[in-house]
């Protein structure tokens, strides 16, 4: 008898002709997540993905809970085609469910097995009732469904541990996220990763107005995001000179929106150079002055690349809840200013007109900064 995990996936099963592509990518991502477990084996048989574990199964489960594309993880036992072994496996699995109701459900694709599905279910149920205290059978609405599958081997499993869901990372191209160090942008990156998008990150650094600790905070956020399946390339752009140019030469009410437009232009250049097909931001409609629908329209007009804003309809409390769930919140609230919080005007324009903003931009020579920005690349 061997402990294994049965991996359940949702949307992948709906992908038609591309199903094998998604399944193979998921298997590759599972192997990557478990690469330092020498005793783990991953395989796909009968349309199922199995993970065989000889070591710490709980630690393996914790890793798998961060693999996008997995909707459920089920602890299972693989045994020989022997009723006594099947009974033993069923009893072990049900020992954690005392006081509950259960039902046994058997599938028997292997028709050479001498007992039919009903007989296997009946015998397994009797063995469980005999050896596990305080259990009752409920065939209509059981607390626990105990499954038995009779194939070339027998598989016995019960209960499901919730996975993270989504699509396997790497199945939907690559995008570049503008990562500020605040609460919102890492959540936006995570949400796009959940839809199968690989991400790179751009952080705008403005020393001496922003400290090295602010940059370290962004590096730490990338480390957390990388736990969900990929190493993240962080592009640190030195933004001080361009930010001072904006502050000194542009009307105060437009400095925030112009700064956002310059960031977009630089991020687009980095994205194009590195094979990204879109930008990602953590903007939520109406949250601050630069996130009104008019401001977002003006920001969009600065680039030709699509801009994804997965948080656009979320409340701040919803964003914070998700940040706490994915373990970025405590890092994001470290008290170190980023470049978006310096030189903030008292009365920023909330309904800027594109032509007025472009006119204001002409007061400075911004193109030389965009063409010759200083960049540091950190792989996390």
Curated annotation (Swiss-Prot):
Pathway: Cofactor biosynthesis; thiamine diphosphate biosynthesis. It catalyses: [ThiI sulfur-carrier protein]-S-sulfanyl-L-cysteine + a uridine in tRNA + 2 reduced [2Fe-2S]-[ferredoxin] + ATP + H(+) = [ThiI sulfur-carrier protein]-L-cysteine + a 4-thiouridine in tRNA + 2 oxidized [2Fe-2S]-[ferredoxin] + AMP + diphosphate; [ThiS sulfur-carrier protein]-C-terminal Gly-Gly-AMP + S-sulfanyl-L-cysteinyl-[cysteine desulfurase] + AH2 = [ThiS sulfur-carrier protein]-C-terminal-Gly-aminoethanethioate + L-cysteinyl-[cysteine desulfurase] + A + AMP + 2 H(+). Belongs to the ThiI family. ATP binds at residues 178-179, 203-204, 260, 282, 291. Signal peptide: none annotated. GO terms for biological process: thiamine biosynthetic process; thiamine diphosphate biosynthetic process; thiazole biosynthetic process; tRNA 4-thiouridine biosynthesis. It is found in: Cytoplasm. Keywords: ATP-binding, Cytoplasm, Nucleotide-binding, RNA-binding, Thiamine biosynthesis, Transferase, tRNA-binding. Catalyzes the ATP-dependent transfer of a sulfur to tRNA to produce 4-thiouridine in position 8 of tRNAs, which functions as a near-UV photosensor. Also catalyzes the transfer of sulfur to the sulfur carrier protein ThiS, forming ThiS-thiocarboxylate. This is a step in the synthesis of thiazole, in the thiamine biosynthesis pathway. The sulfur is donated as persulfide by IscS. It is an enzyme of class 2 (transferase). Pfam families: ThiI, ThiI_fer, THUMP. This is Probable tRNA sulfurtransferase. GO terms for cellular component: cytosol. The lineage of its organism: Bacteria, Bacillati, Bacillota, Clostridia, Thermoanaerobacterales. GO terms for molecular function: ATP binding; CCA tRNA nucleotidyltransferase activity; tRNA binding; tRNA-uracil-4 sulfurtransferase activity. It comes from Thermoanaerobacter sp. (strain X514). Residues 58-162 form the THUMP domain. Its EC number is 2.8.1.4.
